[in-house]
Amino acid sequence: LAWTGLRALSVHRDQRTWGERLLADLATDDPSFLVYVSLAARQSKYIVNQWLPALDALPRNGLVVVREANQLAPLAPTRHPVVYAPTTRHVEGLTLPGVRVAFYLAYGERNATLLRDPRLRHVMLAHGDSDKATSASALIRAFDETWVAGPAAIDRFRTAGIDLGPERFAVIGRPQVAGLPVGPSGREPRVLLYAPTFEGYYEATTHSSLDVLGVELVRRVLAGHPELRVWFRPHPASGVVRPSMLAAIAEIEGMLRAAGDGNLVVADRGLTMTECLAGADVLVSDVSSVISDYLATERPVIVCDPAGLTPDAFVAAYPSQASSYLLGPDLAGLDTILQQVLGDDPLREARIAMKKHVLGDPPGGPQAAFAANLDRLCESDVRGPS
């Protein structure tokens, strides 16, 4: 439990007094929502932390309920109490009378512990927008509502045959990217950010270019494009499935450290993903939410296709990449693509249109839409057990 002392909430007989006192303390904040965290080891670092600033900016108070102890240390600071609740009884004790909404950030197996509570409104926020298969899971049917960044996410569900009614969706934009700069930075030399995605746990989510073309990409940019500086930021979970990812990371980091002169291993500087996106003039990434978030800047995007699909097949499979420059596994056309993105950028207008489709355009901005939709659910009729 990270309430004040990293102790586990307990209502067992020998600790009942302490547990009741803790619940009373939590109730004084009058929380109206909770964030339910059940993830694979240490995923809170990149799944939960990206939502904490938006959650902290909400006018309403909430709780962060963590099911696994290994998620606690990676959590960033938050104004909301963080409660370690390892058992079903602990979770049940935290559905305080004023709590009306439960937010979920991933499709964890242990979500069912809370989903069965009929009094709450269960809302999937997810942890990013992309054309990955996991972004259109049939598990979405378990939730009362899904709050998405933009219309592209709703289209994605329908294409996958998951045609829920419009009342099951709310478009709130992406609060995480509301503060990113828009348009060219005007800085020289310009920065190319290479941010490959996670390799995925199964075939349908194998999108990472890191161990396919990443090393050669960085080598060629360093050797042939002195007008650029390369920043490297691999997905934090890289190497969990494929050890070859770790070898690629080590080789790229070695090249960048040797090159110096503004070329950067992001981990050496401790930059956040938001800082990386703000500092980049060009993004090279894979099918992932990183590209969706970077659309907020309206700057050029190069998407890697490690599978080597034809351009038509790639866009058919990943529609939100229609406004990205496509780079195949053999890096064919790399110099031409870089000339385009650093020059007249012929995909700029298509990218600006895609930005609205992917990230939405809610009145008042994403944070206001986030807060307004929470108010809507909190002020709706209380549901009782059915």
Question: Which residues fall in each region the model found?
Answer:
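Short acidic-hydrophobic, aromatic-tinged amphipathic segments that line or gate anion-handling sites
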Residues: P81-T87, I172-G173, L264-D268, A322-Q340
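C-terminal amphipathic helix plus adjacent low-complexity
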Residues: T336-S386
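A nucleotide-sugar donor-handling region in carbohydrate enzymes
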Residues: W3-W18, A142-V212
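Donor nucleotide-activated moiety binding/catalytic core segment of transferases
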Residues: M245-S292
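Conserved catalytic-core segment of nucleotide-activated headgroup transferases in glycan assembly
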Residues: R42-A57, V177-G254, L359-A368, S386
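Non-catalytic membrane-proximal stalk/linker segments that position and tether the catalytic domains
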Residues: L1-S32, P385-S386
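Catalytic binding pocket for nucleotide-activated donors in carbohydrate/polymer assembly enzymes
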Residues: S289-V358
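Active-site and donor-binding regions of nucleotide-sugar-utilizing enzymes
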Residues: Y36-V177
